[in-house]
Amino acid sequence: MSPQTETKASVGFKAGVKDYRLTYYTPEYETQDTDILAAFRVSPQPGVPPEEAGAAVAAESSTGTWTSVWTDGLTNLDRYKGRCYNIEPVAGEENQYICYVAYPLDLFEEGSVTNMFTSIVGNVFGFKALRALRLEDLRIPVAYVKTFQGPPHGIQVERDKLNKYGRPLLGCTIKPKLGLSAKNYGRACYECLRGGLDFTKDDENVNSQPFMRWRDRFLFCAEAIYKSQAETGEIKGHYLNATAGTCEEMIKRAVFARELGVPIVMHDYLTGGFTANTSLSQYCRDNGLLLHIHVAMHAVIDRQKNHGMHFRVLAKALRLSGGDHIHSGTVVGKLEGERDITLGFVDLLRDDYTEKDRCRGIFFTQSWVSTPGVLPVASGGIHVWHMPALTEIFGDDSVLQFGGGTLGHPWGNAPGAVANRVALEACVQARNEGRDLAREGNTIIREAAKWSPELAAACEVWKEIKFEFPAMDTI
């Protein structure tokens, strides 16, 4: 063997495959304030020890690969590697473990949710040694939080822009979601807004289809906003969906919305992508637009209990990427959402600081420092009988969005909006008077219906409508 090709053990590199746990399982590690911490629910393949599975997650989502490579000697792996520092079995589940992994901050580009997720929830989710893998929670260190702009404006600035305080905001998604012409769509918006709603909304499917091009929709909705504002004396808005096939087209639509003088635009942030969302959020901050975020596609990622990513992680990512509203489930409506878990990530959206609380699924204490809060949006299968529960569960800093619960009113859109506004005002007044909304909710609605024929009609239509299915995702 020639000197040029000879290898020596003393060089420090030995080819071959070694157990991940020898390098990446470090139970003695003390986490740093600057580490990104992740809690993974790991289901190893039969015969794979949990320590090896947890170490494999840490390795494959940071510096590791399947074999030893000589270029490991050209860097400081102890500085850059992820570390599985704790493993605990999941109570009541066989062969499932919560594996805690710490990532040094230098692994991630500043201000990039895209880069963070590419590492933490990248190829490792297809790793054969694991039957399933789910990211349950992240702790984003303050040092990394400060590299993001966050929401364009936040809760307090939005209230100041709208001049609306002391109650949840009311919205409505226009139905049918597809097929209306732009003029009829604008008419539906106008009827809802003049009836007492604060917002109407494009459905997530509405972009720029042959039956209704985006520019026509924007124009007719702007007309509805200004006409209803003139009649009611209240500031109104419509979530104009700027989501498009390219970032350039998305920004063009947002620019047109700004030129029309409307207060808010909308983005489907998962189908549109985090890079596009962050760009739109920064444009909205610079140009005074509020940004409503829809979560279409989230259930593909978060619905399964043992694989994917929990919605609380998506919510944290959105607060970093930027959005003033985000759909968060209803607890009482037609969409998935267990109460304690939902309130856990609602607090993560709104509060500056959230303590670790495993009873609500919060694995880490999280500080958002000066990052503005995000309004949770309760939407999906809700109607006037749900109003007391929604007011009690979500409080004032929320948006309650009734699509079918407005447009399905037997007398039309405007009476449907009146019914929802009367029900909301009655619940807020009762709460402020010290009444128990959880116990007296139905009585409060019936009392208000005596003075509002619109509410009485709504109560009759939806008196037996319930969505009582168990949540799939529980603690």
Swiss-Prot record:
Pfam families tied to this protein: RuBisCO_large, RuBisCO_large_N
Subunit structure: Heterohexadecamer of 8 large chains and 8 small chains; disulfide-linked. The disulfide link is formed within the large subunit homodimers.
Miscellaneous comment: The basic functional RuBisCO is composed of a large chain homodimer in a 'head-to-tail' conformation. In form I RuBisCO this homodimer is arranged in a barrel-like tetramer with the small subunits forming a tetrameric 'cap' on each end of the 'barrel'.
Propeptide boundaries: 1-2
Function field: RuBisCO catalyzes two reactions: the carboxylation of D-ribulose 1,5-bisphosphate, the primary event in carbon dioxide fixation, as well as the oxidative fragmentation of the pentose substrate in the photorespiration process. Both reactions occur simultaneously and in competition at the same active site.
InterPro entries in UniProt: RuBisCO, RuBisCo_large_chain_AS, RuBisCO_lsu_C, RuBisCO_lsu_C_sf, RuBisCO_lsu_fd_N, RuBisCO_lsu_N_sf, RuBisCO_lsuI
Post-translational modification: The disulfide bond which can form in the large chain dimeric partners within the hexadecamer appears to be associated with oxidative stress and protein turnover.
Binding residues for substrate: 123, 173, 177, 327, 379
EC number: 4.1.1.39
PANTHER family: RIBULOSE BISPHOSPHATE CARBOXYLASE, RIBULOSE BISPHOSPHATE CARBOXYLASE LARGE CHAIN
Major site of localization recorded for this protein: plastid
Site (Transition state stabilizer) residue list: 334
Name of the protein in its database record: Ribulose bisphosphate carboxylase large chain
Domain of life: Eukaryota
Name of the encoding gene: rbcL
